[in-house]
Amino acid sequence: MSDEETEQVEEQYEEEEEAQEEEVQEEAPEPEEVQEDAVAEEEREEDEEEEKPRPKLTAPKIPEGEKVDFDDIQKKRQNKDLMELQALIDSHFEARKKEEEELIALKERIEKRRAERAEQQRIRAEKEREPQNRLAEEKARREEEDAKRRAEDDMKKKKALSSMGANYSSYLAKADQKRGKKQTAREMKKKILAERRKPLNIDHLSDDKLRDKAKELWDTLYQLETDKFEFGEKLKRQKYDITTLRSRIDQAQKHSKKAGATAKGKVGGRWK
C-alpha cells in the first residue's frame, strides 16, 4: 500500500471521529435554572434518547483487496525521522568540515603573508646595505688614491730636497719618520675599521628593534660625516703648510744659486 493511500485512510478516519464528537456535543443537554424543570427535561431527554437511534460507528473505508499495515506506517515514519536526523547530522558535519577547511586556508594565507613580509624585509635590508657598501668602497678608493698621491708627493719632495745638499738631510729624516708614523697610524686605522665593520644581520629583528638599529646607523653615519669634514679641514691645513714649505724651499734654492754665482764672479775677477 502506498504512502498516499495510507494518508488518505488516516485523514478519512480522523474526519469521521470529529463528526461523531460534534454529534455528541450537539446532543448534550443545557442546564436549567429550576430544579423541577431540569428533572423533567432529563426524563424527556432520556425518553428521546431511547427512541432516537444511536449513530453507528463505521470503520474507515479501506480499498478493496488491500489491508492497512499500521506497523508499516509506523516503520515508515520512523525511517523518515531517521533520514531527517541523518540529513541534519550530515549537514552539521559538512558545515564543520567546511569551517575546518576555511580555517586551514586562513592559516596557510597567514603563513604565506609572513613569508612574503620576511622576503620583502630581506630585500629592503639588502637595498639599504648597497649604499653603505658603495660608500665603503668609495672611501677605500679615495684612501688608496690619497696614499698614491702622498707617495708621489713624497718622491717629489725627496728629489727636490736631495738637490739642496746635506743641510736638509735631517729634515728628510724627520719627514720619513713622520711619514712612517702616519703610515703606521693609517694601517692601524684600517685594521680597527675592519674589526669594527661587521656584517649587518637584521632578518630576526622586530619593527621596534629595526627602528633602533636604523637610528643607531644614522647616528654613526652622522658622526662619520662629521669626522670626514674635520679631516678635510685638517687636510686643507696640511696642504697649506706643504705649499708654504715648498715656497720656502724654492726661495732657499734661489738664494743658494745666487750666492754661488756671486762667488764664482769674484774668483774670476781676482785671477784676471
Swiss-Prot record:
Known tissue expression: Expressed predominantly in skeletal muscle.
Transmembrane segments: none
UniProt KW keywords: Acetylation, Muscle protein, Phosphoprotein
Region described as Disordered: spans on this chain: 1-75, 114-193, 248-272
Domain of life: Eukaryota
GO cellular component: troponin complex
Species per Swiss-Prot/TrEMBL record: Mus musculus
Lineage: Eukaryota, Metazoa, Chordata, Craniata, Vertebrata
UniProt-recorded name of the protein: Troponin T, fast skeletal muscle
Location of Phosphotyrosine modifications: Y222
Gene name for this UniProt entry: Tnnt3
Modified residues (Phosphoserine): S2, S91, S162, S169, S170, S206
Biased composition (Acidic residues): 1-50
Post-translational modification N-acetylserine, affected residues: S2
One GO process term, biological-process aspect: regulation of muscle contraction
Biased composition annotated in UniProt, kind: Basic and acidic residues: 63-75, 114-156, 184-193
InterPro entries: TNNT (IPR027707), Troponin (IPR001978), Troponin_sf (IPR038077)
SUPFAM superfamilies: Troponin coil-coiled subunits
